[in-house]
Amino acid sequence: MNDKTIPVTQPSLPELAEFMPYLEKIWKNKWLTNNGPFHQELEEKLCEFLGVQHISLFNNATIALITALQALRITGEVITTPYSFVATSHAILWNGLTPVFVDIENDGYNIDYRKIEQAITPKTSAILPVHCYSTPCEVEEIQKIADNYGLKVIYDAAHAFGVNFKGGKVYLTMVIYQFLVSMRRKSSINFEGGAIISPDAKTKLRIDRLKNFGIADELTVTAPGINGKMSEINAAFGLVQLKHIEGSISKRKIIDSLYRNLLKGTPGITIFPGNINTNSNYSYFPILIDDGFHMSRDQAYELLKKNNILSRKYFYPLISNMPMYRGLISASVDNLPIANSVADKVLCLPIYTDLNEEIVVKITKLLLGKM
């Protein structure tokens, strides 16, 4: 069908000429890292864009998540979702903590807040939900539970940059962003970065020290920190990309709508509508393929691949079924029936800013057996 491979996602890059003046300034300043002027400017611009006061930039979102757990001095058990990229649970494990998995919603992909309370034990100290596929969790309900039990809440918002929820950008308590970054699902990383939104200046100060080896000043180290600093080049790229984020979202929205219209009403294919109070960033287009469709999920994946179209079984396998986690009591299939069922059915179709609408039509025709 295609001579050229269609990736499941692709970076949306500015014109190189737009980026060059930033590089020239970096070369002139000879300031490559350690809280340079572009780093400082990006923190300020992101605060304005998201409507928050305290942001800390990181070299990537995984290091940010590890640092957030460390900054809040989390101990014992952390309630989280099995339906996410593995970095979510790895960050918990790297802190010497135990992830406790809770099943996802029956009509979505996020953690089911109604099942959180039964997973709380005397060892529980935090809840780590994920805004999956850019759809916000039930943040108000989760916060009520956290307040009742004295728990911290850290949101992994890697999917949710630029998402509006009930009239405001998605954030609450502490948020980990993988922002302004497009990746070919880890196979070809172009620019990378992460950020933490903190609830107050004191928490931001601790985070900023932790990401810089725990250094407080030239003579004082206050904590066993790491190197999580964002470089000036990545910060500069973030500043350029921030100018285009709304336009990119608008273009992906068109692709999302086209997929929905072409696949609407197809027996055996489920497309969740998303939260009615949310304006998505349209970075993912997941469908669920069940026995009512004329081929299985895996057959659809192979058919697309045979025609040089890369889809992804995202998230399969579940985190809870991976070797380092499947021994946990909470990882049992009986405890996570919905997440396991969704993981066996999900297929993310190509969606990115520069995806041609004609390709979307061809992808859907191929799936529906019309070619």
Swiss-Prot record:
Disulfide bonds: none annotated. Gene3D superfamilies: Type I PLP-dependent aspartate aminotransferase-like (Major domain) (3.40.640.10). Pathway: Bacterial outer membrane biogenesis; lipopolysaccharide biosynthesis. It catalyses: dTDP-4-amino-4,6-dideoxy-D-glucose + 2-oxoglutarate = dTDP-4-dehydro-6-deoxy-alpha-D-glucose + L-glutamate. Its EC number is 2.6.1.33. InterPro entries: DegT/StrS_aminotransferase, PyrdxlP-dep_Trfase, PyrdxlP-dep_Trfase_major. It comes from the Bacteria. It is an enzyme of class 2 (transferase). Its cofactor is pyridoxal 5'-phosphate. GO terms for molecular function: dTDP-4-amino-4,6-dideoxy-D-glucose transaminase activity; pyridoxal phosphate binding. It holds the Pfam family DegT_DnrJ_EryC1. Keywords: Aminotransferase, Lipopolysaccharide biosynthesis, Pyridoxal phosphate, Transferase. Belongs to the DegT/DnrJ/EryC1 family. Catalyzes the conversion of dTDP-4-dehydro-6-deoxy-D-glucose (dTDP-D-Glc4O) to dTDP-4-amino-4,6-dideoxy-D-glucose (dTDP-D-Qui4N). This is dTDP-4-amino-4,6-dideoxy-D-glucose transaminase. It comes from Escherichia coli. The gene is vioA.
